[in-house]
């Protein structure tokens, strides 16, 4: 729900005509758009809640991934940390000195949509041990992570290839970690509510229209 105390402000220009943006956005919402669908409760995640039971009691997790493969889950964890009773460590670069090395085993979420991200592969080879439990999230095609999952006999979750990194937080990439954090992932799927909120919808149109106006007229900060 959107708090009534939130004031939607924008940087609109009075010269902007937003009717075309409104028309295109209305058409887009009515179309069968898989990326938009991933933001709603209609999207079906490619993981089974029953299969995650063996991980639910675990308290320590590592999320190994670069860019959009980990930033969404990291944002959720940072924002809702006061509600989360588990520890999540995010390995999103090649500096791993801050990781607790004394711990004998971890539950690893290894995420790369292409399955061939070099930094992720390097960290995986440096960090994971035989006794670790691993879940790998990647596209359903021949790649390094799928081969690794077979070798480790690890759980594999296939990520839909039509959802890019910056849009992936509400797909398996962000929702699987959120589920393991003990959060209700349905609470994140608010698209259907937002598009019915006139204030949100009108401000979205206004902001997009203004952005296009400034770009077309080469007005940059």
Regions found by a protein language model. Name each.
Residues 6-14, 18, 29, 107-110, ...:
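Short, structured coil/loop segments at alpha-helix boundaries
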């Amino acid at each position: 729900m959107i708090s009534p105390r939130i004031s939607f402000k924008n940087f609109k220009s009075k010269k902007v005509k937003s009717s075309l943006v409104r028309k295109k956005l209305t058409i887009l919402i009515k179309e069968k758009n898989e990326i938009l669908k991933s933001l709603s409760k209609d999207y079906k995640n490619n993981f089974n809640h029953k299969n995650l039971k063996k991980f639910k009691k675990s308290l320590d997790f590592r999320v190994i991934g670069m860019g959009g493969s980990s930033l969404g889950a990291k944002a959720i964890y940072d924002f809702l940390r006061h509600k989360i009773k588990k520890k999540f460590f995010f390995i999103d670069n090649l500096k791993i000195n801050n990781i607790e090395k004394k711990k004998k085993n971890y539950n690893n979420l290894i995420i790369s949509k292409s399955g061939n991200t070099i930094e992720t592969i390097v960290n995986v080879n440096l960090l994971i041990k035989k006794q670790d439990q691993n879940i790998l999230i990647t596209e359903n095609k021949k790649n390094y992570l799928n081969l690794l999952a077979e070798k480790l006999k690890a759980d594999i979750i296939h990520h839909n290839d039509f959802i890019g990194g910056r849009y992936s937080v509400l797909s398996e990439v962000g929702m699987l970690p959120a589920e393991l954090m003990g959060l209700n992932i349905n609470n994140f799927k608010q698209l259907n509510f937002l598009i019915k909120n006139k204030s949100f919808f009108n401000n979205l149109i206004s902001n997009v229209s203004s952005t296009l106006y400034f770009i077309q007229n080469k007005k940059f900060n």
